[in-house]
Regions:
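DPxDG-like acidic metal-binding loop motif
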Residues: 35-36, 111-131
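Glycine- and acidic-rich phosphate- and metal-coordinating loops
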Residues: 83-84, 88-107
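Structural signature of FAD isoalloxazine-binding scaffolds in flavoprotein oxidoreductases
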Residues: 29-48
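A short glycine/serine-rich beta->alpha loop
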Residues: 25-29, 64-73, 103-111, 146-151
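ATP-dependent small-molecule kinase catalytic core of the GHMP/sugar-kinase superfamily
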Residues: 27, 127-172
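Glycine-rich, flexible beta-strand/loop modules in the N-terminal catalytic cores of phosphate-handling
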Residues: 43-90
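Short, small-residue-biased leader/transition segments that mark boundaries at the very start
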Residues: 1-4
Length: 172
């Protein structure tokens, strides 16, 4: 019935290039990043899988039990970490959701696809649950997920640019 009406929430996270200062943001140095138009989009909807979430892209399909939600050592960790950290922050049990991921952002070549993935997922969760996460909270949470859960070491520049960047203006 009405419980499974297809409510779709979308989040988008952008990639970036860094004009100067690569590897300096996590050492306290100056950087000059620029958001690019390439992005990762997370479409989030309710599913009928009790106590599970499903994650899909054009090359990936996985259904995960909420009871056993833990690191998988693949790119799904960005979504899993987002579910766990977002759920903890807002006291929400994340379940019965489908995450459909699409991307125009090449992965693994230094354009901050990890930040874009985490940001897009958190934005979709924020929209779906109608929470009031500020941009600063989103940036901090995405940073914590990448560093504490996924294990991607780095500074906060990538998350900052993905959320607050402008494709026509570098950030200093």
């Amino acid at each position: 019935g009405d419980v499974y009406k297809r409510q779709v929430s979308v989040g988008e996270g952008y990639g970036r290039v860094n004009l100067i200062g690569e590897h300096l943001d996590y050492n306290g140095g100056c950087v000059l990043p620029l958001q690019i138009k390439n992005s990762i989009i997370c479409e989030l909807s309710k599913n009928r899988e009790i106590d599970c979430i499903s994650i899909a892209s054009d090359k990936y399909q996985k259904t995960l039990s909420i009871e056993k939600l833990k690191k998988t050592d693949d790119w799904a960790d960005f979504i899993i970490g987002s579910c766990l950290f977002f759920g903890e922050k807002y006291s929400i049990i994340i379940k019965e959701l489908s995450f459909n991921i699409s991307s125009t952002l090449p992965l693994g070549i230094g354009l901050s696809s990890s930040a874009a993935m985490t940001v897009s997922t958190l934005k979709a969760l924020n929209n779906f649950y109608k929470t009031t996460m500020s941009d600063d909270e989103l940036i901090d949470l995405a940073y914590d997920i990448e560093n504490s859960f996924v294990g991607v070491g780095g500074g906060i520049m990538d998350q900052f640019v993905s959320v607050l960047g402008n494709q026509n203006q570098a950030l200093y």
